[in-house]
Amino acid sequence: MATHAALASTRIPTNTRFPSKTSHSFPSQCASKRLEVGEFSGLKSTSCISYVHSARDSSFYDVVAAQLTSKANGSTAVKGVTVAKLKVAINGFGRIGRNFLRCWHGRKDSPLEVIVVNDSGGVKNASHLLKYDSMLGTFKAEVKILNNETITVDGKPIKVVSSRDPLKLPWAELGIDIVIEGTGVFVDGPGAGKHIQAGAKKVIITAPAKGADIPTYVIGVNEQDYGHEVADIISNASCTTNCLAPFAKVLDEEFGIVKGTMTTTHSYTGDQRLLDASHRDLRRARAAALNIVPTSTGAAKAVSLVLPQLKGKLNGIALRVPTPNVSVVDLVVNVAKKGISAEDVNAAFRKAAEGPLKGILDVCDVPLVSVDFRCSDVSTTIDSSLTMVMGDDMVKVVAWYDNEWGYSQRVVDLAHLVANKWPGTPKVGSGDPLEDFCETNPADEECKVYE
């Protein structure tokens, strides 16, 4: 019988280069437009390679040959396996809801299908505000009103419903699998649970959850802990926690965080007042576009929800400022490791940005300002020139984030993770055929290359 090596010589062109295991280490359940995939794949950077369970019985070279044939022959790009898509509803078509839809629309091989939005403004508002956005500009997709309860996005129909009571939403009738809860109102178990009662199977809260019964996930930090049976309601944390947690993880792993404080200089949001008016927070009651507004944030404490070892070690505040988008975190920590330099700290971030946090964390060496980070896909961008070390154990790190677009990209990623873990759904591949093959065939001889 021919050996694997002999088979390989007949199936795989000798000039084909396999990507290294770290060449695209962005979390396997998703892909962003900044993700660089291996030369062999022939996939667009927004794609995910699907690897069906039935391929487990094939040899490694059968799997690779199937991935390579089109590319080697100079034909069209390799396509992922077509599977039934999960039906998604967006509850609350505000800043995050509309950003989420745009981000999802950009993922051409998404396992999701947005089929309905709940917007109190109806089809006219939903279509107009999706198409025309003061921050994002005009949506390149074709957005039309089909009838008094449906809009279309590039020809795809999306139903528009209007109800402030989740119990009255037609999730059962429409067969909704996942609800993106974007109102900021239904953030606890009883509130978000109304979507489950209405017929949805899973709920992703796009805000910090209230209650210890709702697990929180930050992509790049603890998404590996998610499983389909863990919970029906989960939280994507806040935009600030998504910025802070990845680089706090790097700092803690490399240098050991002892304690620290964080300040986020945060763009104003819809929770503030345009002009002075009543608000439960007397500072947020003041005109958002005219003031620097100190206020509370649970982002630093919430880091412990995804990095339990940091519980009680971090706290912080927010300064809301008169900018409409993009925010910046300033973290100061004492670390256990002594005698480090700013270069050491930045080197740790660069290593993470090219490795386990690729697509999540970036490092910027150019002296930029907030507007330059609009529509940044990553969760956090370290401003390397602002990294400081005082004495032998105090570290200051400054990181930028698009609190709307970047955060919404992570909501899409988390929804993709939920889809990837859905029972009976073919698993989305990492993009590396060898890695995918060895995950399901660890005893195979070819997998010893990883030892």
Swiss-Prot record:
Marked site: Activates thiol group during catalysis: 266
Chain residues that bind NADP(+): 95-96, 119, 164, 403
Record organism: Pisum sativum (Garden pea)
Assembly and binders: Tetramer of either four A chains (GAPDH 2) or two A and two B chains (GAPDH 1).
Pfam families noted in UniProt: Gp_dh_C, Gp_dh_N
Transit peptide extent on chain: 1-84
Compartmental location: Plastid, Chloroplast
EC number: 1.2.1.13
UniProt-recorded name of the protein: Glyceraldehyde-3-phosphate dehydrogenase B, chloroplastic
Binding site for D-glyceraldehyde 3-phosphate: 238-240, 269, 284, 297-298, 320
Protein's UniProt keywords contain Cell membrane: no
Lineage: Eukaryota, Viridiplantae, Streptophyta, Embryophyta, Tracheophyta
Family: Belongs to the glyceraldehyde-3-phosphate dehydrogenase family.
